[in-house]
């Protein structure tokens, strides 16, 4: 039962990206899995909250100047709890996810040679019958508007924490890279957000899938490879935690 729907579009105030589409190429090696990233306590706490939550956001669809839908709110109705909602419900959830962000930032920055800032957290439920067609996170990828920004052009990198696996279907797939897999509970995943990395989710056929999606805005590229068309300069450089836990990275491999 849905007890409440909170109207909110919790978008970041950022309006662009310094990282052009295609900057990270199209290799499958840019799609990374970190197994057992969450502790058992973190995973259990977040899953218990998500699976018992009955309060979800209400958002508004948006179109660009050509009339193309760049955000379809109907797809996410009664399925998403973003920062504003989570803060009203349980601040410990927000604090726990931010702690995960802090740990993961070290690995993301190191892997892509960037200084990146995480967007606000959200929890998404995927009940039976839901699915997601292939899409890019920061831009449109089909039709006459392909390559134009969607409603989130600052989503340079995608991040995902998975909370459970007691469902059928719900596999994450990348058509361009030829891979499809069921994400592991407690794991973290990240990959570029442009149209070289379009991805989708197969239909949930039983159970409910719970995910924490978020994104990274790249504030700075930290090695010799620099984008040609920088748009923004940033002052809020984040400090790395020298005491972070070492995580072994494992790129997702193509299925033979």
State the predicted function of each range.
Residues 52, 128-129, 162-165, 194-195:
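Glycine-rich, acidic and aromatic/proline-enriched surface loops and short helix-turn segments
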Residues 51, 95-147:
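Non-heme Fe(II) oxygenase catalytic core, chiefly the N-lobe of the double-stranded beta-helix
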Residues 38, 50, 138, 163, ...:
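Short beta-strand segments enriched in hydrophobic/aromatic residues
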Residues 58-62, 135, 224-227:
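Short, solvent-exposed loop/turn and secondary-structure capping segments
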Residues 155, 166-256:
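Catalytic core of Fe(II)/2-oxoglutarate
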Residues 2-111, 233, 255-256:
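Non-heme Fe(II)/2-oxoglutarate
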Residues 123-126, 142-168, 218:
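Short, conserved beta-strand element in jelly-roll/cupin
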């Amino acid at each position: 039962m849905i007890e409440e729907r909170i109207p909110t579009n919790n978008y970041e105030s950022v309006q662009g990206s310094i990282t052009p589409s295609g900057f990270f190429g199209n290799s499958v090696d840019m799609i990374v899995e970190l197994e057992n990233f969450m502790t058992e306590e973190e995973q259990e706490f977040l899953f218990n909250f998500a699976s018992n939550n009955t309060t979800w956001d209400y958002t508004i669809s948006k179109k660009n100047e050509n009339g193309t839908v760049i955000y379809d709110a109907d797809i996410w109705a009664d399925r998403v709890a973003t920062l504003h909602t989570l803060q009203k419900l349980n601040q410990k959830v927000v604090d726990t996810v931010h702690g995960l962000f802090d740990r993961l930032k070290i690995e993301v920055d190191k892997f892509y040679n960037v200084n990146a800032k995480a967007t606000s957290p959200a929890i998404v439920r995927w009940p039976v019958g839901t699915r997601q067609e292939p899409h890019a996170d920061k831009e449109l990828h089909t039709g006459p508007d392909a390559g134009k920004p969607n409603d989130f052009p600052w989503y340079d990198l995608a991040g995902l924490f998975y909370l459970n696996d007691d469902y059928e279907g719900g596999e994450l797939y990348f058509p361009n890279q030829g891979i499809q897999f069921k994400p592991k509970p407690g794991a973290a995943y990240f990959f570029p957000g442009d149209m070289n990395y379009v991805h989708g989710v197969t239909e949930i056929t039983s159970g409910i899938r719970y995910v924490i999606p978020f994104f990274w805005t790249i504030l700075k590229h930290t090695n010799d490879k620099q984008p040609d068309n920088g748009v923004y300069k940033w002052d809020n450089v984040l400090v790395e935690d020298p005491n972070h836990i070492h995580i072994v990275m494992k790129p997702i491999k193509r299925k033979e």
